[in-house]
């Protein structure tokens, strides 16, 4: 499918078999637990031998033949970022490429009917127009305010669907050989081999030329700076391109769910500098005793020496950058701790660890809580409160950090930093933990991710529910059968777990969840109105 994708595409995703994804989804634990509760019809998929027969002969209903034969790709051509009132809106220019391996005459009525139904779901009050440009017919569904579009064309066995005509025309030009394609890209081929794309359900790729652009788009979210500063964006993009190479993704079934694997390629010099400091400590993370078991998300940093790792990242990256880019990178790196009221990250990290976690107690929480074991309490009080004797005294005492919208507390050899109401919740949990000896669900998460330098657990209920809701919108299914039972089932879902480690080529991330990235992609196609 890379033969149809523009060589300069920002993001490229592909799937070579729809039905393999469908089979993986219906075999997950979450599917079998929830589909009846959510009113999803049980439509059996053809077996593997029947799929091969349909693919080879083309015998069967046309929709089934298309599903059995189709390969699909998604390309993002531009981010489409616009600034308004100090907020950044991202509206990517993108297209879906569907290679049906079936004649245009056979697929056209089926494809047009499917697109009509999709437009009716995706755009309320959509109107249809057709026009021809250079012997190519474009089918366009537009929202009443013309703010949204679905544009499609059929060229032989290839169907191209985009969110504007330019995206569709760009991909059409690639198919006709008028623009270079992505197929021969060396980084793409290397990423395919590394992530074993041929054995995966789906594969994704961002070239080194474009990874910096994506980093620069996300930087304002980390630093808290106003979006739209072109000079800042260019500095971030230029700096990122000197340390970050291509980015890849693959997906496959695993342990009753879906595992997503990501690779962020780093320069060999940076990998060798970081390797000695990215060793995961094996100690039990006692700081989890102050975290509620129903927490929305928690990230555990298990480095043997957090300060040494911080320094290694700073110096390792700085050696690859010019002076100005180094200053910008350092400010971005520090921003992660500045949000907790920590103005001096170096001295802070000298006084805490090796156990460090960040946690969001509730989904709606705007800020996280940072919790760490204390190495030098007097020095830490100096960092936080400006004097070694300052700050909260005694157990379960909370005190605001001067000049910051955050607070701190010391309990059982740990420091807690974050919004005051969240700290009081954690302190209450610490008191309960002293009376209980049960194995917490979070302890199981830490045990199962012991080899990773960074591990994150996130409640998966929202993504599972959104996936099924999107599926219901797509199929026109009924309402959930039992809301109370559904709520209980959602509460019992296992955490989505992400493990991050430093591998041979760069940063590797593995995420085990109910439906993987497919749980996020389907709601994008069938959003809530």
What are these language model-derived features?
Residues 100-105, 163-168, 374-378, 419-423, ...:
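Helix N-cap motif at beta-to-alpha junctions
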Residues 132-148, 395-404:
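Short, Gly/Ser/Thr-enriched beta-strand-loop segments that form substrate-interacting elements
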Residues 1-144, 188-244, 259, 263-364, ...:
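Structural boundary/hinge residues at secondary-structure and domain interfaces
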Residues 115-123, 178-182, 388-395, 434-435:
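A common structural junction motif
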Residues 74-87, 147-156, 357-361, 404-412, ...:
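Short, surface-exposed beta-strand/loop micro-motifs that present aromatic residues
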Residues 281-285, 408-409, 415-416, 495-529:
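A cross-kingdom marker for long, charged
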Residues 153-159, 257-259, 294, 365, ...:
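Short, solvent-exposed coil/turn segments at beta-strand boundaries
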Residues 147-222, 398-487:
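A conserved glycine-rich beta-strand in the N-terminal activation segment of trypsin-fold
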């Amino acid at each position: 499918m890379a033969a149809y994708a523009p060589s300069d595409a920002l993001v490229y995703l592909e799937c070579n078999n729809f039905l393999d994804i469908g089979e993986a989804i219906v075999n997950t634990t979450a599917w079998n637990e929830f589909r009846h509760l959510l009113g999803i019809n049980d439509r059996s998929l053809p077996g593997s031998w029947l799929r091969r027969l349909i693919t080879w002969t083309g015998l069967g209903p046309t929709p089934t033949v298309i599903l059995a034969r189709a390969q699909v790709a998604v390309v993002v051509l531009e981010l489409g970022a616009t600034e308004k009132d100090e907020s950044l809106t991202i509206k990517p220019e993108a297209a879906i490429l569907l290679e049906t391996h079936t004649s245009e005459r056979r697929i056209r009525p089926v494809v047009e009917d499917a697109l009509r139904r999709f437009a009716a779901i995706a755009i309320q009050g959509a109107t249809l127009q057709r026009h021809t440009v250079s012997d190519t017919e474009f089918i366009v569904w537009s929202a009443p305010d013309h703010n949204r579009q679905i544009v499609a064309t059929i060229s032989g066995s290839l169907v191209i669907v985009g969110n504007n005509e330019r995206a569709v025309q760009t991909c059409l030009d690639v198919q006709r050989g008028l623009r270079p394609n992505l197929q021969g890209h060396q980084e793409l081929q290397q990423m395919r081999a590394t992530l074993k794309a041929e054995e995966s359900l789906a594969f994704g790729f961002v070239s080194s030329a474009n990874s910096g652009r994506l980093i620069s788009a996300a930087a304002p979210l980390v630093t808290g700076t106003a979006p739209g500063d072109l000079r800042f964006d260019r500095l971030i993009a230029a700096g990122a391109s000197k340390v970050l190479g291509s980015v890849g993704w693959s997906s496959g079934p695993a342990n009753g769910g879906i595992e997503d694997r990501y690779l962020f390629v780093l320069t060999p010099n940076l990998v060798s500098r970081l390797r000695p400091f990215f060793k995961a400590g094996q100690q039990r993370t006692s700081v989890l005793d102050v975290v509620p078991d129903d927490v929305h998300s928690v990230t555990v940093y298990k480095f043997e020496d957090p300060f040494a790792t911080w320094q290694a990242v700073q110096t390792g990256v700085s050696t690859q950058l010019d002076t100005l880019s180094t200053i910008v990178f350092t400010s971005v790196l520090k921003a992660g701790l500045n949000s907790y009221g920590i103005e001096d990250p170096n001295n802070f990290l000298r006084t805490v660890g090796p156990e460090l976690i960040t946690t969001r107690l509730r989904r709606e929480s705007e800020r996280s809580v940072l919790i760490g074991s204390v190495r030098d309490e007097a020095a830490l009080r100096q960092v936080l409160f400006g004097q070694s004797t300052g700050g909260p005294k005694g157990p379960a005492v909370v005190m605001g950090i001067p000049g910051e919208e955050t607070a701190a507390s010391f309990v059982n050899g740990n420091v807690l930093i974050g919004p005051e109401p969240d700290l009081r919740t954690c302190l209450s949990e610490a008191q309960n933990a002293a009376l209980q000896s049960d194995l917490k669900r979070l302890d199981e998460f830490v045990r199962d991710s012991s080899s990773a330098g960074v591990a994150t657990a996130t409640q998966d209920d929202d993504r599972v529910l959104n996936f099924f809701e999107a599926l219901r919108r797509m199929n026109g299914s009924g309402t959930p059968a039992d809301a109370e039972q559904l709520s209980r089932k959602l509460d019992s879902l296992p955490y989505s777990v992400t493990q991050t480690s430093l591998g041979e080529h760069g940063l590797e991330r593995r995420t085990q969840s109910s439906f993987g990235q497919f749980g996020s992609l389907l709601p994008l196609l069938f959003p809530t109105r």
